[in-house]
């Protein structure tokens, strides 16, 4: 049983499926409308709005507005903004919210709404306030507890876990964190250590990895930091867990040869359809992207 917090489009579920693991996503936590609608398409297919075909716009708004959803992943969408959307779009949103069993805004979740018997809780919390890219825009707030920013939503996971424990419910057996490797930098290390200490206090054993996607067959170099947290019922289990991680160190595994880019991208631009798709996918011309381009020797060849 898996719960995906900050689920986005469901990359964790996709990985479990690819690995052939028997799993069930019992809930997701995602307030970004585009993200959970995409999640529904990717994992469940075309939206089924049949149960809601007779819902009026007013009925849909009465259900959607209290959920505190977002259209940009940054700020809550207002009732006025939601009302401007077509009734068909609102039906798709409501259908996706229900079919993904979405608990919505993580700030509204507690031990009462969090499911029981959870094996794995994943939490790829927002990276904008931790990333080097954010630092370029003078954003250094990171995961400070009082930052009141997107990356600081990490501490909502702490709140939920504490409320579960204090009210006698079972904690998830495993936690899986993923974020940018800058979380280990001098600026953010003390906060990250605080988080690890809090998890240990709750009874978890933590193992941190920094891994490059290119070492696992991906056609790109993407370094990310992961933390696996294992709930320990007793000290004997801790000895076993420590030995397991020692024997199965992901940072020491044999590196796989990256797959060729052509396997993932349609690069035959003599095909007018592929060329048009490539043109549409070009990133917007912004000052920050120009700065990146001009400072990259490979792109500027």
Predicted regions and their residues:
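S-adenosyl-L-methionine-dependent DNA methyltransferase catalytic core
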Residues: 1-26, 36, 66-76, 85, ...
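A short acidic, often aromatic-flanked loop/helix-cap motif at beta-alpha or helix-coil junctions
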Residues: 108-111, 213-218
């Amino acid at each position: 049983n898996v719960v995906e917090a900050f689920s986005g489009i469901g990359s964790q579920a996709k990985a479990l499926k690819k690995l052939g693991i028997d799993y069930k996503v019992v809930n997701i936590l995602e307030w970004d409308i585009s993200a959970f609608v995409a999640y529904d398409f990717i994992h469940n297919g075309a939206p089924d709005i049949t149960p809601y075909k007779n819902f009026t716009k007013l009925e849909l708004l009465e259900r959607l507005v209290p959920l505190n959803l977002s259209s940009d992943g940054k700020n809550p969408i207002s009732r006025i903004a939601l009302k401007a959307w077509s009734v068909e779009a609102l039906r798709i949103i409501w259908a996706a919210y229900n079919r993904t069993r979405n608990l919505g805004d993580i700030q509204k979740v507690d031990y009462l709404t969090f499911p029981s018997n959870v094996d794995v809780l994943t939490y790829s919390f927002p990276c904008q306030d931790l990333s080097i890219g954010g630092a370029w825009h003078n954003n250094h707030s990171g995961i400070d507890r009082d930052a009141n920013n997107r990356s600081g939503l990490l501490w909502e996971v702490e709140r939920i876990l504490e409320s579960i424990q204090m009210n006698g419910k079972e904690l998830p057996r495993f936690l899986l964190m993923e974020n940018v490797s800058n979380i280990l930098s001098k600026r953010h290390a003390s906060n990250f250590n605080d988080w690890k200490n809090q998890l240990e206090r709750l009874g978890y054993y933590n193992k941190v990895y920094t891994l490059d996607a290119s070492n696992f067959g991906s056609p790109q170099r993407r370094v990310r930091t992961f933390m696996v947290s294992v709930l320990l019922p007793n000290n004997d289990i801790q000895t076993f867990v420590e030995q397991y991680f020692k024997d199965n160190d992901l940072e020491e595994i044999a590196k796989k040869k990256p797959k060729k880019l052509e396997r993932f991208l349609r690069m035959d631009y003599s095909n007018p359809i592929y060329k048009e798709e490539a043109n549409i996918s070009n990133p917007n011309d912004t000052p920050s992207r120009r700065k990146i381009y001009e400072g990259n020797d490979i792109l500027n060849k």
